[in-house]
Amino acid sequence: MKLAFLISTHTDVQQLQRLVCALPDESVFFLHVDKKSDINIFKLAFLDDGRMKFIDHRVNVRWGSINEVEYQMELVRAALEYGEQFERLITISGMDYPVWSKEQIVQFFEKDRKKEYLAAIDVSFPWRMSAIYQQYFFWIHKPKSGWEYYVTRAFGRALKMLGIKKPLCKKIGDKTYKLYKGAAWWAITPKLAKVILHEWDTNEKLKDWLKWCMCPAELFAQTVVLNDETWKEKCMLDNEKYSLPMHTPLTYVTWMNEEIKTLDESDYDKIIQSNKMFCRKVASGKSDGLIELITKKEMR
């Protein structure tokens, strides 16, 4: 089974090397290196590994902005245009690490070749979430050091105080889109990837609607797919409440002090109990003990 891993990275080459070595040998890795980072450091580290494909289209990534979707779609494009056919396109970050062995990962995807591991929730259900996505985040793509950031943030707050809300549905042509949220990490078939990429390339009104939302990378693919009757039933929809474990179906993630926690050996038991394929985030030094425990488990 041929898998394509679509990896976003910006730091910690040592961790990236460790990640790639732990994934199935027959895989191909498509990498986006943040434009702020020196790509030559990454290329030098993988000089002799023909499986590593660095995409030329690089983005100066700003967390929470639409340009996270931009690089994600360019990774999808690179995989679809590659000379070989893949069974799955799997999005991960360079700070992920597989909890499962190479063999377990391949066997998992071989069991159900049609299921799409892309989860979402209709944001109009939980009140707190709907309130967030009714706000205009004009400042999200602005550098915090510039005056534009503060002006646009003040404008967004003024709209909120005036009760001016961003709609949770958008009519584009003869189709009405509802807003769905999930995670930026998913594993999908090339057929579905083509549908999502086509919308990115052709549906400017959809992109404009999502542009001023918080974290469009957690919205774009989900909104495209869950508004498509052909694909909706093949994905994972939760109609009740937002659940981080459900919306990251293959990845263990936990938060600490409003940030994704850098995992260490104290997290090992919870990671194993989650039965997730990956955990994130891990970093050289701080997570070395955890990686050692996972490696020992795989060798038993």
Regions found by a protein language model. Give the residues of each.
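ER/Golgi luminal nucleotide-sugar-dependent glycosyltransferases, focusing on the catalytic module
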Residues: M1-R300
